[in-house]
């Protein structure tokens, strides 16, 4: 798993040196978005690590139902927040690409299967109060549904098959490969920022903040 720590090394090269520059607002937007994109990517990584650690302990608790239930509650809480953080990282990436003048890439993300899966999970978790109280046969499964009862959300959430969790028509693999598309987007965004802001501004910023600039970027 990856940790992202570029923001504090490069924000001086992104933000304007003086007030009143024509692209001042845009540059502050990019700086702020990069800061929070890294925060949510790192939250996602931290939650993933917690999930994997807790998952390994479940098999040792098969004879201790109370502790097993407790650990599963913690694990699915971490999965919940991991998915919310992933969706936030996607949304921040889309906004950054729009501001950086890459609307086609932003639209590609919106239509990608990776984003659709995470967004579906996040939307259903956010609106679980509706999902838990409305009969819905759209995603019924033979192993829990009958003609009188089909609370699909309640039956599917907090169940896993191997590394996969299923919700409605989508499955999410709790594996590093599920994060690679999001990481690649970050790398694309950071390259754009490097080419268009960091490299062109580095000499002037280093002169203006001599002795106070980040040691490396």
Where are these regions (language model features)?
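Amphipathic alpha-helical interface segments
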Residues: 1-114, 146-217
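Histidine-centered, metal-coordinating catalytic motifs and their short helical/loop contexts
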Residues: 112-137
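Aromatic- and Lys/Arg-enriched surface recognition patch
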Residues: 133-150
């Amino acid at each position: 798993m990856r940790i992202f720590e570029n923001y504090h090394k490069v924000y001086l090269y992104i933000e304007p040196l003086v007030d009143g520059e024509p692209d001042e607002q845009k540059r502050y937007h990019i700086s702020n978005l990069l800061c929070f994109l890294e925060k949510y990517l790192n939250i996602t990584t931290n939650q993933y690590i917690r999930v994997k650690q807790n998952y390994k302990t479940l098999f040792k608790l098969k004879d201790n139902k109370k502790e097993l239930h407790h650990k599963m509650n913690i694990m699915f809480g971490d999965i919940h927040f991991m998915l919310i953080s992933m969706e936030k990282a996607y949304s921040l990436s889309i906004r950054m690409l729009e501001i950086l003048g890459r609307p086609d890439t932003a639209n590609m993300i919106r239509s990608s299967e990776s984003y659709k899966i995470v967004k579906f999970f996040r939307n259903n978790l956010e609106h679980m109060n509706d999902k838990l109280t409305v009969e819905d046969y759209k995603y019924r499964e033979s192993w829990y549904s009958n003609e009188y009862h089909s609370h699909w959300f309640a039956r599917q959430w907090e169940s896993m098959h191997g590394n996969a969790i299923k919700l409605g028509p989508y499955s999410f693999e709790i594996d590093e490969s599920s994060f690679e598309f999001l990481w690649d987007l970050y790398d694309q965004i950071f390259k754009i920022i490097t080419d268009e802001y960091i490299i062109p501004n580095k000499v002037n910023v280093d002169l203006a903040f001599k002795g106070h600039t980040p040691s490396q970027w």
